[in-house]
Curated annotation (Swiss-Prot):
Belongs to the universal ribosomal protein uL18 family. Part of the 50S ribosomal subunit. Contacts the 5S and 23S rRNAs. Keywords: Ribonucleoprotein, Ribosomal protein, RNA-binding, rRNA-binding. It comes from the Archaea. GO terms for biological process: ribosomal large subunit assembly; translation. This is Large ribosomal subunit protein uL18. InterPro entries: Rbsml_uL18_euk (IPR005485). It comes from Thermoplasma volcanium (strain ATCC 51530 / DSM 4299 / JCM 9571 / NBRC 15438 / GSS1). The keyword tRNA-binding does not apply. This is one of the proteins that bind and probably mediate the attachment of the 5S RNA into the large ribosomal subunit, where it forms part of the central protuberance. The lineage of its organism: Archaea, Methanobacteriati, Thermoplasmatota, Thermoplasmata, Thermoplasmatales. One of its GO terms (molecular function) is 5S rRNA binding.
């Protein structure tokens, strides 16, 4: 009998084992129907220990009152996760996307760009990130001004 999470299609145990054998902390990205969740976790015998968690709803703490899972929100969640990870003492991590497929220029790639821009070192190729036009929201009706949002993050970092 297979594990329940494998039968339900929730966990790829082969991929999880490879990630855990690396003994690096994991940057976990989960895209939901209405939002995005980013976490930094490390393995523990008693269960994974979550060091930092950021969702699209938590961006209001940084002065961004938008929710969703578009490309810009994913970038900002990744950036915020990087800020929180550095507060927790995390300098390097590996990307954990679960059973999702990684698409070049997609939402997970935008989240990855956000965390690398914040200063956390995650192995990646430079060609996987979204175009700057898409990241700046030129394809959206009401784009977020990313430069202003990142400045808000930096101001809050200096205050803390």
């Amino acid at each position: 009998m297979a594990f329940k999470r494998k039968v339900l299609g929730k966990t790829d145990y082969g991929r999880r084992l490879r990630l855990l054998k690396s003994k690096d902390r994991r940057f976990i990205v989960r895209i939901t129907n209405k939002g995005i969740i980013a976490q930094i976790a490390e393995y523990s015998v008693n269960g994974d220990r979550i060091l930092a968690t950021i969702t699209d709803k938590a961006l209001s703490k940084y002065g961004i009152e938008l929710r969703g899972n578009n490309l810009q929100i994913c970038y900002l969640v990744g950036y915020a996760a990087g800020v929180e990870a550095q507060k927790a003492g995390v300098e390097t991590a590996v990307l954990d996307i679960g059973r999702k497929k990684f698409r070049k220029g997609g939402r997970i790639a935008a989240c990855l760009k956000g965390i690398t821009d914040s200063g956390v070192d995650i192995p990646h190729g430079e060609d996987v990130f979204p175009d700057k036009k898409r990241l700046n929201g030129s394809h959206l009706k009401n784009p977020v001004k990313l430069n202003e949002a990142v400045k808000n993050f930096k101001k809050l970092e200096e205050k803390a």
